[in-house]
Amino acid sequence: MTENTDAPAPERADLRPPGLNADEHTTLLTFLDYLRTCVIAKTDGLSDEDARRPGVASGTSLLWLVRHLTAVELNWFLWAYRGDDVEPWDDDAPSPGDETVAGSVAAYREAIARANEVIVSAAAWPDRPGVRSLRPNAEAPSMRWLLVHMIEETGRHAGHADILRELLDGSVGR
């Protein structure tokens, strides 16, 4: 593949990963919060229509990713770990045509705040299992497992968000 040196390089809008030397719980939560912020940043300046636009053949859009991450925050931390009754979310359901960037991001931020309450309340017991698992026939995971899993889940989808945003308007960066 030949590189076009005449085209200007896209401007990068990077958020830098946190740099701290802290205990395990603080480090894990700080990295999770960093990734959550990266996902939200990918919606900045987009119209609702663009954010709903599928960027790949699977139909995934930036707003779908935000909705999905909202659901997994609530499902893992509140439903599975703490045992709350949260309304299930169907990954296969199409995005409603009237969803907005502002509304979706607000719902995600609210889910993050609720999840963080659970995370902070369990800081002293990282190995204590939660109430149940989202995985059939699996033991309830510990908070340590949940934090690592959510870093992986959110990081994977932050990468998807990077690509979707670049496909929409050429924006690059974390």
Description of each model-found segment:
Residues 94-131, 142-151:
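Acidic/histidine-rich alpha-helical segments that form the ligand environment
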